[in-house]
C-alpha cells in the first residue's frame, strides 16, 4: 500500500512522546482529579494506557464507535459498546475521554453527546473535529492521513537515489 501524498506516519517513539505531552497538558486540567478515563476504542486504547499511567488514573472504561470500516474512508457510525451507566451520571463531569485522533468530529460528537460535561482529549486533531475536543497535542490538515504505529509493519524501503538515478 503506498502512502497518500499527505501522509503523517507516526512511530511508536513519537506516539509515546505525544501521549506523554498530552498527559502533561491534562495534569493541570480539572485540578488533576479525574474519576475515570473513557477511551474510544480502538484508537483510544494506547493513549489511554499511557495517560492513565502518567496521571495515576485507575478506572478505565471503553466506548466503541466504529467508523473506519475499510481503513481508507469513514463509513456509517455505529455504537458497538456503550459506556457504563455509573460514569454517565452527572453528564460525565470529572471524566476524561481519550482518543488517538479527531478527524471529522463525527465520532467525537456521538461520545460528546453521551457525556457533555466530560473533558475530551486527543493526541491529534484535524480542523473539522477540533471544535469538539478540549485538549490535543498536534493539529494536522484535514487532507492528511495519519498512519499509527499499530497499523503499520516494517517493510523494505528503496533508497531515495534509486528514484533519482540520472
Curated annotation (Swiss-Prot):
Superkingdom of this entry's organism?
Answer: Bacteria
Q: In which pathway does it act?
A: Purine metabolism; GMP biosynthesis via salvage pathway; GMP from guanine: step 1/1; Purine metabolism; XMP biosynthesis via salvage pathway; XMP from xanthine: step 1/1
Q: How does it sit in the membrane?
A: Peripheral membrane protein
Which terms are listed as keywords in the entry?
Cell inner membrane, Cell membrane, Glycosyltransferase, Magnesium, Membrane, Metal-binding, Purine salvage, Transferase
Q: Where along the chain is 5-phospho-alpha-D-ribose 1-diphosphate bound?
A: 42-43, 99-107
Q: Report the EC number(s), separated by commas if there are several.
A: 2.4.2.-, 2.4.2.22
State where it is primarily located.
Answer: membrane
Give binding positions for GMP.
103-107, 145-146
Residues that bind xanthine: 103, 146
Q: Which GO terms describe its cellular component?
A: plasma membrane
Task: Explain the purpose of this protein.
Answer: Purine salvage pathway enzyme that catalyzes the transfer of the ribosyl-5-phosphate group from 5-phospho-alpha-D-ribose 1-diphosphate (PRPP) to the N9 position of the 6-oxopurines guanine and xanthine to form the corresponding ribonucleotides GMP (guanosine 5'-monophosphate) and XMP (xanthosine 5'-monophosphate), with the release of PPi. To a lesser extent, also acts on hypoxanthine.
Subunit record text: Homotetramer.
Family classification: Belongs to the purine/pyrimidine phosphoribosyltransferase family. XGPT subfamily.
Q: Could you tell me what this protein is called?
A: Xanthine-guanine phosphoribosyltransferase
